[in-house]
Amino acid sequence: MKSFASLLFLAATAAAHATWQQIWVNGVDGGTSCLRRAANNNPIDVGAKELACNAHTLSPNVCTIKPGDKVTVEMHAQHGDRSCAQEAIGGNHYGPVMVYMAKVDDARTADANAADWFKVSEMGMASNNPVYWAVQVLNDNCGHWTFTVPDLAPGNYLIRSEVIALHVAGSIGGAQFYPGCFQVNVVGNGSGRPTETVKFPGAYKATDPGVLFDMYRPQSTYIIPGPRPYGTSPATVANTPYPTTATWNTALQPTTVPTVTPPVGGGTNPPPVTTVAPPVVTSQPPVPPTTQQPPVVTPTAPPSGPLQTQYGQCGGQGWNGPTQCQPPYTCTASNQWYHQCL
């Protein structure tokens, strides 16, 4: 029989839902055209081979970028849902946001586990007065995270974006990893070849200070896992309130994925863009339903007071917010400080 603590951990893991889904280049929406699609939106273990990209399906395309471009990667809780009504990664899954890149021969077929990854963007604890995390900044901006492409030699690369959720990271194995990858071709006259690289898995250990971390104890700093970023300064922790105003124009956020892909390329010989005919869907005629009496439903009184949404916090030591959940969710304890609607 599983222990109560292990059941709480499994409940917290099951509640975590988010994947990286879209890419933008200088404000142009590239959608999922060069995304390595994830099999599902569950977190990845620190030692799993899926930690590299969490990829189930590779893309036949690469998106073209160059040094100095502003690249935005986009995360959402459910696949295909680009609305800002729901947090990109909810349930107070606070922690760092990082972006890595790796030079490869052909981004369309490259083995992400064999790649040499260098970091190009990071943010951990944005402020300690009050504590404000990179994930909160991500959520403020409807799941959009923007970085500048550093000086890089031309060629194919993989982009790896990542969230580490620390809400149950106070014990070994509690940190939850949400990576995702995009396939790109860097053009231009750059010459940079980063040398401080890591492998995934292998870049992090379960006992690293930024992986094994109790976010419910008073903390004034946070050590971001992984190497120092290339082409930009390491992130710092502010001791003044972090601005919560979105820098991304959420009012212009599209609700669908674009049907026209951005320019593609594959090294020296760009691959042809092929048009795939829509699948032919066949179905059997519906079987008439059998007649039966409807079940007798006994109405229940709706819960009173303010209700928390799915994955939102609903209890825990020091919590003063809603303690009841919107139907059909129930308030479930992850630990003594954090309960959420599952």
Swiss-Prot record:
Keyword Cytoplasm in annotation: no
Protein localization: Secreted
Q: From start to end residue, where is composition biased (Pro residues)?
A: 285-302
Q: What class of enzyme is it?
A: oxidoreductase
Give one GO molecular function term. Answer: cellulose binding
Record key words, sorted: Carbohydrate metabolism, Cellulose degradation, Copper, Disulfide bond, Glycoprotein, Metal-binding, Monooxygenase, Oxidoreductase, Phosphoprotein, Polysaccharide degradation, Secreted, Signal
In this UniProt entry, which cysteines form S-S bonds? C63-C181
Q: Which residues carry this modification: Phosphoserine?
A: S59
Residues with the modification Phosphothreonine, per the entry, are T19, T57
Which range is the signal sequence, renumbered to this chain? 1-18
Q: Which residues bind O2?
A: H167, Q176
**Which residues are recorded as binding Cu(2+)?**
H17, H93, Y178
Q: Which reaction does it catalyse?
A: [(1->4)-beta-D-glucosyl]n+m + reduced acceptor + O2 = 4-dehydro-beta-D-glucosyl-[(1->4)-beta-D-glucosyl]n-1 + [(1->4)-beta-D-glucosyl]m + acceptor + H2O
Q: What is its main location?
A: secreted
The Enzyme Commission number assigned here is: 1.14.99.56
Q: Kindly give the Pfam families that the UniProt entry links to this protein.
A: AA9, CBM_1
Q: Per the UniProt entry, what is one GO biological process?
A: cellulose catabolic process
Describe the function of this protein.
Lytic polysaccharide monooxygenase (LPMO) that depolymerizes crystalline and amorphous polysaccharides via the oxidation of scissile alpha- or beta-(1-4)-glycosidic bonds, yielding C1 oxidation products. Catalysis by LPMOs requires the reduction of the active-site copper from Cu(II) to Cu(I) by a reducing agent and H(2)O(2) or O(2) as a cosubstrate.
- Provide the family line: Belongs to the polysaccharide monooxygenase AA9 family.
By what name is this protein known? AA9 family lytic polysaccharide monooxygenase AA9-X282
Species source reads: Coprinopsis cinerea (strain Okayama-7 / 130 / ATCC MYA-4618 / FGSC 9003) (Inky cap fungus)
Q: Which gene encodes it?
A: AA9-X282
